[in-house]
A protein has these predicted regions:
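Buried hydrophobic packing segments
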Residues: 84, 111-115, 185, 247, ...
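Active-site segments that bind and position negatively charged phosphate/pyrophosphate groups
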Residues: 198-305
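C-terminal charged capping/lid subdomain of soluble metabolic enzymes
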Residues: 183-186, 278-351
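Non-catalytic interfacial helical region
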Residues: 85-102, 111-126
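A glycine/threonine-rich phosphate-anchoring loop and its flanking beta-alpha core
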Residues: 15, 113-203
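Short glycine/serine/threonine-rich phosphate/pyrophosphate-binding segments
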Residues: 106-113, 134-135, 245-246
Length: 351
């Protein structure tokens, strides 16, 4: 078993091994000591794994109450989280009880947010079931929902007590959803690891999936430990996300997936960096070629002016502009604050 410890307060472990899902109850029991659990999942994941996880939890003596919501970003809104909180209240859950999130990024974000606000905060465990959630969203404590004005504008930092990653669950992912997660993996290569990026260029990621997950999560772990609440270095993890979130908003969080949008955003911001001379020439093309290897989109049909306009609601905006995560070359990243009036010029050569 591969194990990482995230040294925040409270610290927690990330466990990675094929077959861990069958041990869910035993593992959860090590960190959640209450009597009741809300098992939160969606309509895609619960039919696949929900009953077996529920049985595993019940075998440890928990009373388990499953809450299953409609799968997809369309459900990631305040009302869904309020429904979860009311569900937990109806079941008589107390501060000693907990939440188990079984699903992808949307599930983890909402279940974690519900846990953060129910009774002013109860413990929760992440069991991510998509590549995207295993390598990114399940780690770091960011929880929340979308608003009509933009993505992830309502939320809280609430660290899980444990993250259980079973790579076997990725076998049920379609190629599309596997590629969706690759967008975040490629991001880690772009901002921190030229060797990971090169390996993704030259090998099949499914041949080294546990190593891939471990390296991605370890990269995020280090950044989160250094900057838990995103006051500095953690903003590097937003590489491609400012443009990406704007694109998701323009598609009403439906047509273009998060990983696809981030991929497009990485190409856009790398090209913008090349335009103003702070990113090595050819970097955007290299990212584009790697995304295309996984059949991912590399451009959006919306005019750049519309994408820039949609950035106005980005949570990283200040009164002086937007803080962009950028790269000087593959594997080296930095933060650049760009005044709003200079952003169109920076993206000016992107068609």
């Amino acid at each position: 078993m591969k194990k990482l410890t995230v040294n925040v307060n409270p610290k927690y472990d990330i466990l990675i091994e094929k077959g861990l899902l069958s041990m869910a109850g035993e593992l959860v029991k090590t960190v959640l000591t209450g009597k009741k659990l809300a098992l939160i999942s969606d309509t895609n994941v619960y039919p696949l794994y929900g009953e077996s996880v529920k049985a595993s939890l019940e075998a440890q003596g928990y009373a388990v109450y499953e809450y299953v919501f409609r799968a997809g970003e369309v459900s990631k809104k305040p009302q869904t989280v309020l429904d979860m909180v009311e569900f937990m209240a109806d079941k008589g859950m107390t501060r000693g009880d907990g939440v188990v999130a079984l699903g992808g990024g949307v599930c983890g974000d909402m279940a974690g947010f519900a846990a953060s606000i129910f009774l002013r905060g109860i413990d929760f465990v992440q069991i991510p079931t998509t590549l995207l959630s295993q390598v990114d969203s399940s780690v770091g404590g960011k929880t929340g929902v979308d608003l009509p004005q933009g993505k992830n504008l309502c939320g809280a930092f609430h660290q899980p007590r444990l993250v259980i990653i079973d790579p076997n669950v990725l076998d049920t992912l379609t190629d599309h959803f596997f590629a969706d997660g690759m967008g975040e993996v490629i991001k880690y290569g772009c901002i921190k690891s030229s060797s990971l990026f090169a390996r993704l260029e030259n090998e099949n990621p499914k041949d080294f999936i546990e190593d891939l997950i471990f390296e991605s999560v370890d990269t995020k772990r280090i950044v989160v430990e250094n900057d838990e609440k995103e006051h500095g270095e953690r903003a590097l993890l937003n590489f491609g996300h400012t443009c990406g979130h704007a694109i998701e908003k323009l598609w009403n969080f439906e047509t273009v997936s998060h990983g696809e949008a981030v991929g497009i955003g990485m190409v856009m911001i790398a090209k913008a960096g090349e335009n103003i001379g702070i990113t090595e020439q050819g970097t955007a093309d290299r990212i584009k070629t790697l995304l295309e290897k996984y059949s991912m989109k590399t451009e959006d049909i919306h005019p750049v002016a519309e994408i820039i306009s949609a950035m106005n609601a980005d949570k990283k905006r200040t009164d002086k502009g937007i803080k962009f995560a950028m790269i000087s070359k593959i594997g080296e990243s930095f933060i650049k604050s760009v005044p709003m009036e200079d952003i169109p010029k920076m993206f000016g050569e992107i068609e």
